[in-house]
A protein has these predicted regions:
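A conserved amphipathic helix/loop scaffold
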Residues: 382, 392, 404-534
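Bacterial N-terminal signal peptides that target proteins for export
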Residues: 2-14
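Coiled-coil-like amphipathic alpha-helices with heptad-repeat character
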Residues: 1, 5, 22-23, 75
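Bacterial N-terminal signal peptides
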Residues: 11-24
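Glycan-processing catalytic domains of CAZymes
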Residues: 32-415, 421-422, 431-439, 444-462
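Signal peptide processing junction and immediate N-terminal pro/mature segment
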Residues: 24-32
């Protein structure tokens, strides 16, 4: 019997399966009983929501609307609300904002502000219905005014994930070629002449001067939060520069809205991405990383709950339920009703995750790295039951590692990877990266496994369990683990021997972990936590 097998068998483990919650938990989630539980647990994990500027104008414009929102929040276990000052060209009125703010504070909620930088000034040549040209000096001034207004109302302000630009107008193109960013009357050099170079420098400098600087001049106490979108492979192309912006802002937030993979409008993202991006940005942001943010768009009740699970397994300290108004329509009410029934368990899982260190196969994505033909490959590899530990720095000390085309961003990759391979540790490398490293790194060693992505990461979902099992056998050897399961099954490992297995398929499955059979219902998870030694 291995050490891990003994660990899994040891008395003191707690087993519970989502989808088979106890009647007690379900009763507790039925009404306002959720509110005291959520308040008690908010230092472990809190649920929050956002009132759009338009919600303040419309549904929260009178006392009855505010009371309705209060009741909804309490029934949903929400203990913090964000009140938006600006969105889509509309700035909410000061009196209306303060009326909502004061009422929620009086009821014991935490309250913060929010800004969504859509339809500001000159439109972009790209997503022109929402995104702006920030080379335009008048548009920059409008940004300054918006954030001065928000900072005058709140000590904490989040920026929704439209804080980017995709403009390629004549002025932007000329500035890109000149390798110069101008913010007001100040000029800043740009290190290169690509659109990524220009837009990243533009958004970094604009944030420093007209977001952070402007807000702090009005309110020295204000904390600014930048929310990153879930499309992590394109951040730098549109001006999100996670190294400098994470350093500059007081906190960061993470978009974990994966939605339904098969949805015709919103689909194409597998559920595991919520976990991957939460952990990847959590590593880059460390204590600055506040939480995740997901919505109802393109979801079913099952995918909505999966977004919640992945956010919490990703180590988030807060789950933003976007947004109050949206959750009153379409799939929102059904999603929320199901979420309420799961919140007690989600809070318990959050407490267990918080007290442990994630372990597994290091998955290296350097900041600002290009995916080539392997976009989102990490998400699909995670769906194969390979327990990933996302990282933004080369994982020299990892026990096993996965490398994709993204790793080429690291100028020292060839030397670092050669040393890692020579150490004898298991390495999984994509065929795309292997072809680019031919003649530079010795890959013909028994500890190196090549993953055939064939320039189509979604094709990995078609691999059978029997095709994946040999990969797992090699890569999990340092952890003294054997894991057998179908595709669309995720494994999460912790340093004390605890684990979670989640079934993303629509059929019940049986997985085997070190000889133990684990039966998992469709779209459910099994969590096993080792007690007493944390």
């Amino acid at each position: 019997m291995t050490a891990m097998t003994r660990t899994l068998s040891r008395i003191g483990l707690i087993l519970f399966v989502v989808g088979f919650l106890s009647p007690l938990l379900m009763r507790k989630a039925g009404g306002e009983e959720l509110w005291p539980l959520a308040r008690q647990q908010r230092d472990v994990h809190r649920f929050s929501t956002l009132f759009l500027a338009q919600d303040i104008r419309d549904s929260l414009s009178n006392p009855s609307g505010i009371e309705k929102a209060l009741l909804w929040c309490k029934k949903t276990g929400v203990t913090k609300v964000y009140i938006e000052e600006y969105r889509d060209g509309y700035q909410a009125k000061r009196e209306a904002i303060l009326r909502v703010k004061d009422r929620f504070l009086a009821e014991g909620f935490e309250v913060a502000g929010c800004v969504t930088t859509t339809k500001v000034g000159k439109p972009s040549t790209g997503w022109k219905d929402y995104i702006s040209c920030y080379t335009d000096l008048k548009t920059q001034e409008k940004i300054r005014v918006i954030f001065e207004y928000a900072a005058g109302l709140f000590d904490e302000v989040m920026i929704d994930d439209f804080w980017f630009t995709d403009c390629a107008c004549g002025k932007c193109d000329a500035a890109r070629k000149a390798r110069t960013v101008r913010i007001g009357n100040k000029s800043h050099p740009v290190p290169g002449d690509t659109w990524s170079d220009y837009r990243s420098e533009l958004m970094v400098q604009l944030s420093r001067e007209y977001v952070l600087g402007a807000a702090r001049r009005v309110n020295p106490r204000v904390r600014l939060i930048i929310k990153y979108p879930q499309w992590y492979d394109q951040f730098h192309e549109r001006g999100y520069e996670i190294v400098r912006q994470t350093s500059d802002f007081d906190r960061i937030w993470v978009g974990t809205e994966t939605r339904d993979y098969d949805d015709k409008e919103w689909g194409g993202t597998v559920q595991y991405e919520g976990f991957f991006i939460m952990r990847w940005l959590g590593g880059a942001g460390a204590e600055k990383c506040g939480g995740g943010w997901y919505d109802w768009l393109g979801t079913t009740e099952k995918t909505y709950i999966e977004q919640a699970r992945q956010t919490i397994l990703g180590g988030a300290r807060e789950s933003m339920l976007f947004c109050y108004g949206g959750l009153q329509r379409e799939t929102g009410p059904g999603n929320v009703e199901v979420l309420r029934g799961h919140i007690p368990e989600l809070l318990k899982v959050a407490a267990e995750v918080k007290s442990r260190k994630l372990i597994g196969i290091a998955a290296y994505k350097p900041p600002n790295s290009e995916p080539g033909e392997e976009a989102k490959v990490f998400d699909f590899v995670g769906m194969m039951g390979l327990p990933l530990v996302p990282c933004h720095e080369f994982p020299a000390e990892a026990q096993a590692a996965f490398f994709s085309i993204h790793a080429l961003k690291d100028p020292g990759l060839a030397e670092k990877l050669s040393r890692f391979i020579q150490s004898g540790k298991p390495v999984l490398i994509t065929d795309g990266l292997a072809s680019r490293l031919a003649g530079k790194v010795g890959l013909d060693r028994p500890n190196v496994i090549q993953l055939k992505v064939n320039s189509a990461p979604p094709s990995l979902l078609k691999l059978s369990g029997s095709e994946i099992d040999p990969l797992r056998a090699s890569l999990l050897r340092p952890f003294k683990l054997e894991f057998l399961a179908p595709n669309r099954t995720a494994l999460y490992l912790f340093d004390d021997g605890s684990w979670v297995v989640e079934n993303f398929s629509n059929q019940p499955i049986e997985a085997r972990l070190n000889g133990e059979t684990i039966s998992i219902a469709p779209r459910a998870w099994v969590c096993r936590w080792k007690q007493g030694e944390n």
